From Swiss-Prot:
<keyword id="KW-0539">Nucleus</keyword>
<comment type="subunit">
    <text>Component of the nuclear cap-binding complex (CBC), a heterodimer composed of ncbp1 and ncbp2 that interacts with m7GpppG-capped RNA.</text>
</comment>
<comment type="function">
    <text>Component of the cap-binding complex (CBC), which binds co-transcriptionally to the 5' cap of pre-mRNAs and is involved in various processes such as pre-mRNA splicing and RNA-mediated gene silencing (RNAi). The CBC complex is involved in miRNA-mediated RNA interference and is required for primary microRNAs (miRNAs) processing. In the CBC complex, ncbp2 recognizes and binds capped RNAs (m7GpppG-capped RNA) but requires ncbp1 to stabilize the movement of its N-terminal loop and lock the CBC into a high affinity cap-binding state with the cap structure.</text>
</comment>
<dbReference type="InterPro" id="IPR027157">
    <property type="entry name" value="NCBP2"/>
</dbReference>
<feature type="compositionally biased region" description="Polar residues">
    <location>
        <begin position="211"/>
        <end position="222"/>
    </location>
</feature>
<comment type="similarity">
    <text>Belongs to the RRM NCBP2 family.</text>
</comment>
<feature type="compositionally biased region" description="Basic and acidic residues">
    <location>
        <begin position="126"/>
        <end position="136"/>
    </location>
</feature>
<dbReference type="Pfam" id="PF00076">
    <property type="entry name" value="RRM_1"/>
</dbReference>
<dbReference type="GO" id="GO:0045292">
    <property type="term" value="P:mRNA cis splicing, via spliceosome"/>
</dbReference>
<dbReference type="GO" id="GO:0000398">
    <property type="term" value="P:mRNA splicing, via spliceosome"/>
</dbReference>
<feature type="binding site">
    <location>
        <begin position="115"/>
        <end position="119"/>
    </location>
    <ligand>
        <name>mRNA</name>
    </ligand>
</feature>
<feature type="region of interest" description="Disordered">
    <location>
        <begin position="177"/>
        <end position="234"/>
    </location>
</feature>
<keyword id="KW-0694">RNA-binding</keyword>
<dbReference type="InterPro" id="IPR035979">
    <property type="entry name" value="RBD_domain_sf"/>
</dbReference>
<keyword id="KW-0508">mRNA splicing</keyword>
<dbReference type="GO" id="GO:0005634">
    <property type="term" value="C:nucleus"/>
</dbReference>
<keyword id="KW-0507">mRNA processing</keyword>
Amino acid sequence: MSELYSTPQPFYYDKKSGFTQDEFKHAIDKSSTIYVGYLSFYTTEEQLYELFSKCGEIKRIIMGLDRNQKTPCGFCFVEYYSKEDAADCIKYINGSKLDERLIRCDWDYGFKEGRQYGRGLSGGQVRDEYRTDYDPGRGGYGKQRQFEMDQFSDVNGGDITYQQQILQLQQSQQQHQLYQQANAGGPQNYSGKRNRGADDDSDSFKRQRDNNGSISAGNTPNKGRFRERDEEDD
């Protein structure tokens, strides 16, 4: 039972580590590295040293960086010299508050070059790609949400609320549907098919023309059926 409490229990399995789950567990058992998440983008390395050194001597801290901007993006790795100090870090610092944020500390299998960069499409962390809430400590809205808002802002020439964006999107979709419905029967007018109403009008016109003395094929013109005064036929 004592081994259950002394063996590190990571909260996640990093599928991109290249390890099997057994290999990952073995690496965790030997590691004295801590992953720290939910940090503010504005938390400094000096602040991290001040906090995490309370649990033991620190070998180094590796700040997590935006892959493109090379600026802090909300996580770091803390390497201790001893595994006991790393265990104390998880025991006492995990869930504590730093820069008005509850931070998360978890066992890590060990830092490798390249892991300091965010894995998100825009360069930061994946969690900040799809986040829909506004978090001033992590750059405002999530990247995807901010991209959508910027598109609406550019189209409309200024800042608009998210609710207005959704309303405009719905209106645009409705207008597109109405346009498609209005033009659904349009091609028939140009396909060579005659409109029945147009045929009726044409027949009526022909009868009126014949009745008023139009020229029939092979015949001489006829006088109009209705006369305004008595006249002799030629």
